[in-house]
């Protein structure tokens, strides 16, 4: 009798443990505000020397972007950069960078140059020590013309230290024309 009572208590405890399992939505899955504007702010010696902007007020699909600046940099120069994310609604722009930085462990920015001689190194990390990319150092070498694909990837629970730019799903993707001269 004692043995069957103990076994019954174990089964009840195990079943109760399963039935109390929570199915809440984790904080890391929280939606951030829509991003339909981005500013890349370039500094030399701490002073802002240029800001390049892309805006697509109606978001993906619909109308084409209303603005994509050409990134123009000098050869043989090192820049520090900062990303400013914006949500544009009815002509009003609201900075939403903190919405993404507060969820840094689930996001990563990618800078993918083509046809231009620039080395881009992310200088900030998330709480797990993985690259984020809101801040970066850009070092140009020789003159040239090409493009820079700028991407923000959302990767809840899958972000790693050296992820491929296609891992996760895209929150933002802009192809900036670029010139080093």
Where are these regions (language model features)?
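Hydrophobic helical h-region of N-terminal Sec-dependent signal peptides
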Residues: 10-14
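Bacterial Sec-dependent N-terminal signal peptides
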Residues: 4, 15-40
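First exposed extracellular module after export/assembly in secreted or surface-exposed proteins
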Residues: 28-181
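Bacterial N-terminal signal peptides that target proteins for export
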Residues: 1-8
